[in-house]
């Protein structure tokens, strides 16, 4: 047998009245808390008992809520803002938009899986179906992006392989060309030849300034640049040029000696 309906009137018994007040007060504060959490509403409850004791609840801050309430009361007293004025149609449209926004926000929260206590089984099944459709769409989009990235990576890999093959061919061509140069030409660029001892006769016969100048101009080693085939010809021509120069120097030395003897 169900519980009978309680008649709403003042309880005459003081003890029963106090017990009922405590129970109903706790239930009221609990409902206010649930309302603030489920609906994301700013709720404030103020209760004074028969003896004057204060009981209050606020989802944010009691002072903040009271200040907001006072500002709302002031703005509603200004002409043209109250919905019960000439702009009743506009206010009705605004209320409809607010309700629609509130409903969309509630659906958004349901999609996140937050306030599900008040949903029925049918609503939960419908929500599950929507989430499955959304999940399928997300997976398809993800697979498409991954396939695109994979294709781009393959193209980059093919380009890199072609560039590496081209560079490898160029290196092989250079390697096949450089050894021939090193074998035939590189060793013969610089060669040294010793001077024939016959060309150094002036080292013992020069006198005074002539001896010093000739010693500064002669050396034991000369540097010759040229190809291998030109080495013998160069040495031969050098010997031919040095022979007459040696004779001319000897003649000039003899003349200088004769002049000094005549002066004495």
Curated annotation (Swiss-Prot):
Any idea what this protein is called? Agamous-like MADS-box protein AGL15
Tell me which residues make up the MADS-box domain.
3-57
Against SUPFAM superfamilies, the record matches this protein to:
SRF-like (SSF55455)
Q: Where in the cell is it found?
A: Nucleus
The GO terms describing molecular function are: DNA-binding transcription factor activity; protein dimerization activity; RNA polymerase II transcription regulatory region sequence-specific DNA binding
Keywords in alphabetical order = DNA-binding, Nucleus, Transcription, Transcription regulation
Q: Where is the composition biased (Basic and acidic residues)?
A: 230-244
Q: Where is this region: Disordered?
A: 223-264
Organism annotation? Brassica napus (Rape)
């Amino acid at each position: 047998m169900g519980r009978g309906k309680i008649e709403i009137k003042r309880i005459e018994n003081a003890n029963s009245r106090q017990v009922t007040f405590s129970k109903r007060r706790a239930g009221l504060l609990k409902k206010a808390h649930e309302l603030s959490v489920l609906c994301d509403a700013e709720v404030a409850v103020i209760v004074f008992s028969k003896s004057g004791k204060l009981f209050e609840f606020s989802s944010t801050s009691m002072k903040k809520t009271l200040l907001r309430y006072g500002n709302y009361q002031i703005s509603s007293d200004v002409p043209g803002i109250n919905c019960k004025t000439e702009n009743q149609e506009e206010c009705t449209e605004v209320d409809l938009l607010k309700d629609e926004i509130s409903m969309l926000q509630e659906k958004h929260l349901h999609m996140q899986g937050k306030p599900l206590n008040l949903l029925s089984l049918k609503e939960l099944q419908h929500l599950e179906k929507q989430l499955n459709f959304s999940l399928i769409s997300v997976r398809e989009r993800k697979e498409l992006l991954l396939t695109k990235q994979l294709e781009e990576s393959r193209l980059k890999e093919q380009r890199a392989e072609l560039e590496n093959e081209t560079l490898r061919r160029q290196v092989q061509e250079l390697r096949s060309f450089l050894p021939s140069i090193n074998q035939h030409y590189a060793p013969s660029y610089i060669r040294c030849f010793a001077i024939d001892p016959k060309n150094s006769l002036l080292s013992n016969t020069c006198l005074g300034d002539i001896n010093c100048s000739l010693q500064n101009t002669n050396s034991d080693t000369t540097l010759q640049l040229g190809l291998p085939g030109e080495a013998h010809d160069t040495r031969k021509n050098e010997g031919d040029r040095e022979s007459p120069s040696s004779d001319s120097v000897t003649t000039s030395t003899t003349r200088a000696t004769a002049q000094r003897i005549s002066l004495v």
